[in-house]
Amino acid sequence: MTNSAASDQEPVFIEVGEGDGRRRIAVRAREGAGPGLFWLGGFNSDMKGTKALALDAWAAEQGRACVRFDYSGHGESGGAFVDGTIGRWLEESVAVFERFCL
């Protein structure tokens, strides 16, 4: 990963869940010093929203790591919003954190 501008970053996709509950989750992660930022979007928001982009830009300027992702049914991730549940979105959050933040 590079310290390119937020708009230049291409998403990486990971698979979360099993069987029919499997979802394709879009993630944008930049390496940097810690502590880093882990963006958890709000209800019906996505990682390309103004707040997420502002935090990513700050992280880039400060040399901090930053991880943003879209929950299933949001932004660049797969799935339909109506199929989303708090449990699914929690599972996605944990999977992204474990893959990109540890």
Residue ranges and their predicted role:
Residues 31-32, 100-102:
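Glycine-rich phosphate-binding loop signature in dinucleotide/nucleotide-binding domains
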Residues 34-43:
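Short beta-strand element of the alpha/beta-hydrolase
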Residues 43-56:
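The serine-hydrolase catalytic nucleophile loop
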Residues 44, 79-85:
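Short glycine-enriched, charge-decorated loop/helix-capping segments at active-site entrances
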Residues 83-101:
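Alpha/beta-hydrolase active-site loop
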